[in-house]
Amino acid sequence: MKITKIETIALRDSKNGYGETVVRVHTDEGATGIGQAESPSLVIDAVIRNSEGLEGLLAGEDPTQVQRLWQKMYNHTGLYGRRGVTIAAIGAVETALWDLAGKALGKPVHELVWRSFTTTKVEAEPRRSVTPYATVYPSGENIAQLKRRVSDAARR
């Protein structure tokens, strides 16, 4: 299986102006992995699809080699700056690569990620629970305002 194309899809909430970018990595076998970045779509698209971008860099590569490809993307982006939107673009592509690897190997992504970043057999055993973490947009001035924002967003 080889990477043939990386597609970006711009999404924007017209009410609050927040932008998202969906990234799809396509392969020669018809498989597609999906990732996402909370960054301006035009900039994410430029990092991925410009003549020196991530799409050309990864074309023909095996998408299941996620860690090697992450390092390749990171090394390649030194001239762009390895912060902000560039890292968001790399992260979106990486997520799509993990999705493809999970599909190719018939394993859940969380298991692949967990096992790839642990060093001993004991550490690699699945855990019954983990501490969740989430990043959210600015929450507002108080809890009531936050509840109202979340409730309004859920109704849309």
Predicted segments with their positions:
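A broadly conserved amphipathic alpha-helix scaffold signal in soluble, globular proteins
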Residues: 94-102, 114, 134, 151
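Residues at beta-strand starts and edge strands
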Residues: 19-21, 52, 130
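A generic structural signal for short
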Residues: 11, 86-87, 137-139
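Metal-dependent enolase-superfamily TIM-barrel catalytic cores that perform enediolate-based chemistry
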Residues: 119, 125-156
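Structured beta-strand/loop patches that form or line metal/cofactor-binding pockets in enzymes
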Residues: 1-39
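Metal- or metallocofactor-binding catalytic centers and their adjacent structured scaffolds
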Residues: 26-104
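N-terminal amphipathic alpha-helix/helix-capping segment at the start of soluble metabolic enzymes
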Residues: 1-16, 107-130
